[in-house]
Amino acid sequence: MPLALALVLLCGLGGPGAWGCLQCDQSVLLELRQLRDAIVTKRFHLEGLQARAQALLLSMEGPFFRDYAMNAFVGKVVVDQLEKVATSFKNQAQYIKANSKTDVPLLEELVSFREHAIKELKGALRDYEMKACDHKTCHSFKAEVLDCLYCKKTMPKCVKKKYCFEDGQFRMTLKFQDDNKPRNMVLVGDLVTVGLAILTFLVILIAACTYRQNRKLLLK
């Protein structure tokens, strides 16, 4: 199927660079592939729904969780916590594979499946970030940690404050746009607002002058 091939290429499957966090666990990848093989063509009867389900599952096999971990958080997680997330993820995948839902209800369940996985992964990522960003205690933080970018186990390290918590949104902004663009957009918005205000004032002024001229003509 050409669409499926294009999606595979788009998601960059098959290379270690596409792995991250949950995908570092080969059993998670295997479970996702088996789920995709079991439901996409057999339980979705419309081509549009097949394409959406295929894209959703392939994104989870690809860099989706890695990008989330790196852009919204510092990209590291305690191994023990990640193993719990992975176990829950695989159990949910097996449940979806075994139930009898089809078409739209099944697609909705896949969306909920991904949302639940994000929620659980977020808890593990945030827990590590809170400990690594606490400079009073981070030096004594001991645990086996996984680097979600390289799929390598490492030791926890203190994280600079500029990379912690509220700055996570700033990291996401940097990924998708230059720093100057938001400022330029604000400037353009201000100029448009001022321009519209001036135009409105001129329209009112012209209308008032026209009214006075017409009134004078009527009174003559």
Swiss-Prot record:
- InterPro entries registered for this protein in UniProt: IZUMO (IPR029389), IZUMO2 (IPR042920)
Q: Which residues lie on this side of the membrane: Extracellular?
A: 21-185
Q: Classify the source by domain of life.
A: Eukaryota
Transmembrane segments annotated in the record for this chain: 186-206
GO cellular component terms attached to this protein's record: membrane
**Hey, what's the signal peptide range on this chain?**
1-20
The UniProt similarity line reads: Belongs to the Izumo family.
Q: What is this protein called?
A: Izumo sperm-egg fusion protein 2
Q: What is the species listed in this Swiss-Prot or TrEMBL entry?
A: Mus musculus
